[in-house]
Structures are given as C-alpha cells and as structure tokens.
Amino acid sequence: MKKILVWVILVVLLIGGVWLYKDKHPSLKDNLKTLNETMTSYELSGTLEMVYQDALKTIDVTSMYKKEQGQDYYYVRLEDHHTHQVQTIVRNKEGVFVYSQGFNRPFQFKSEWPNNSFKPYILSSIFSLDFTEEKIQDGKILSAVIQEKTYPNVTHMQVLFDQHHVMKLVSLFDDNNQQVLKFDVITYMINPEIDTDLFVLDSSEEVSSMLTEVLPLYPMHLDNVELIDQLQLSLSLVLRYQGEHYFTLVETPLDKIDDIIEATEVYLLEDGFIYVCDQEVSCIKNGMCTTIYATDLTFDEKLNILTCLENSIVIDS
C-alpha cells in the first residue's frame, strides 16, 4: 500500500512539474501571440520573391509599425530589383495612402489595409495565425493553414526560426506543396524607437517619370481578345471587348477621379496599383484609372487583364 502511495505521489509531482515547466517556458507560438498583443513597434526588412506573370520577381521590403495612443501606424516600402521602381504604402490617422513612382501625388484610400488580408511582411499577419510547432535541428518551424484572396492558390505556410527564436524565412505553398512565395528576413527589431513623422507620406518626393500626355490603355499580349467598340464620354473612355470572355473597360484620367478612393484591398504593381471595392476591380497606372466589368471572369482573370494594360495606338482596319 505504501509503494502504491509513493508511486501516486511521484506521478502527481511529475505531472505538476511538467505543467509548471510549460507554464514558465511557453511555446514559441504562444510567445508570438503574446508578442502580437503587447508590442508597440517593429522594424522589418527582407527580400520578397514570387513568380508574377511567369517571371521571377524580387522585391526589397522595408516594413515598420508603431502603436501610439491607440492608433496603429504602418509603413511599407517596396523596391523592385529589376526596374528599381519604388512604391510606398502608409496607414496613419487620416487613412491609407499609396505613392508610386510615375505619379506626382499620393492616392488616399478608405481601406482596412493591412488588417484585411495576409501580408508576409506585416508581423501581426504572421503572429496572429494558429500555428503548429515542429522542432528541427537548427531551430523551429511553425506551420499554418491560410486561405487568402490575395494569394488564391496558397493553402498553407511555414515560418522558420533559428535556435534563438529569430525569424528567418516566411514561405507560402500551394496544395502541391510547391513554394509560391518566400520572404527572406534580413533584420527585424521589436519595440524600437520610431518617429511618427515617418508615417506621413511626402508627396513632394522626386518623381522619376512624369506623363506629358494621357493616352488610352489597352490590354496587350492577351490571346483571343478583340476590341469591338470604343465610346468617348465626357469624363471617361469605354472600351468593349469580345473573345473567350466579354468584358468592358472604363478608363478615367486621374485628375477626374475622387481624391479619396474606397477600397477593401490594394495590390501594388510594378508601375501602379490595383484596388478592389464592392467587387469592382480597378487599376491606376500610366495616368489612368481603369475599372473592369465582366460577368463571367474570375478575380484572377480580371487581375491578369488589368496588369496587361499598356499605352498603344489602335489602327482601324
């Protein structure tokens, strides 16, 4: 009887010791959730690689965040390795602002960016996920299932940490476990001192190229697409296309659009950006705001058409 009692006491002590150890040594994923709730600022830099229109794009990313008096401030700067085009997106008390080289002013959006979708360079996007944790030889891997409109072919992701719990790599995968996107983390700091003036977008920055003439944009390099009608209205140009799909483009010069644009999502392009509002998908590039209308096109197909827009001269046959 005494032996049984001793064993019971040992088991209780063992279970209690394990519980106490876990309580004093929380898992990495629990630490990240706590950090997400308590951090007041961060600085993050890295290199983003992804396949875009059958070409590998490499983008240098600088991402900063600050919380002050209950207000969240975000700053993201993207620079394309190939074109050296720079785009900046800022969230402050006034709203969301996008500035892209080639435009002489920032654009303001009514948007919940960046909280409305996953961003591999926004720490709150990563730290808030429901992870499973796996220990490896040189650190840990955190895995999570994600379903995002921004990355429709992505089904899951992994975040690699070294043995000191320093984040090194964020990878997104499709259902065939093929890597779709990766973000190599170069540096990041939690709770650094950041000047709030950083989150005020300066529209007086030097612009690399200014348009001297606004020309219509046409979807180039698309197979089985034919322009069937072109109508000039007082403020806009309406272009109707037929082919494998029917769609209409409405193009409006930038000086004719509202100063504040409502958007649920913003996608930065090499030479402009795309935004979504109430199922409408629009593109701002080359001095034009173009909205696409179609009943049988998927979101990805609309994006593909808008990213193919270029200035051209249409010659009637």
List the predicted regions and their residue ranges.
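Flexible, processing/modification-adjacent segments and terminal tails
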Residues: 20-28, 90-155, 194, 206
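Gly/Pro-enriched, hydrophobic low-complexity segments
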Residues: 77, 137-205
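N-terminal leader/targeting segments and the immediate start of mature chains
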Residues: 2-72, 130, 134-135, 265, ...
